[in-house]
Amino acid sequence: MTTKKSAEKKLVSIKKSPKSLGKPMKGRDILVKALVNEGVTVIFGYPGGASMEIHQGLTLAPKIRMVLPRHEQGGSFAAGGYARATGEVGVCLATSGPGATNLITGIIDAKMDSIPIIAITGQVPSTVLGSDAFQETDIMGATFPLVKHSYMIQNVAEIPRIIHEAFHIARTGRPGPVLVDVPKNIQQQEGIADFDVSFDVPSYRPNLKPSILQCKKAAHTIQAAKRPIIYAGGG
């Protein structure tokens, strides 16, 4: 005999286990799988306390090669160089605080030169954000004018969507850097994530059609120039 209580329990179980969901995973492993799904094969990362869980997850991902720079800034520039050389999105990884701020020069370079990179930073646990915790830095605020977009992951279930969005934003329109900040407790937290994600970013609609007026003006300027020089590649 099926009671109302057991029927409700069964219904909840069905709702929590659609076909696109798998077994519970740590946030770090969900993040790594999301990166693999985006085709990432190389990450340039310098480990630290707030990002160590992600590094542990990467040891279980044979498809991703981990390159250890001597300094986080070198990692961000290496990610940019990798993107230039391969046409793929470069990925760099650093811990919180000084590790994250050391990425900034490479992030600025990517913004100025229209290079698609994803900068992933470890962060102090979300439960102590704003308490001046050890090596806590508002890296989202520090890089706000330097990136196309930035995220702080607050729930393991949203990791696949955020990573998918970050790569889409980095590589489309005028390419550029995107920051993904991941608190340590989110890296450690277990949850069930849906990797069959779709997204819609209403505020992000890059205009890929050139202005006819601007094209005519450029053509007239080139035609009238005696010694024209074209400097191309600014995105």
Regions found by a protein language model. Give the residues of each.
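N-terminal alpha/beta PP-like core and its mobile active-site loop of ThDP/TPP-dependent enzymes
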Residues: 2-235
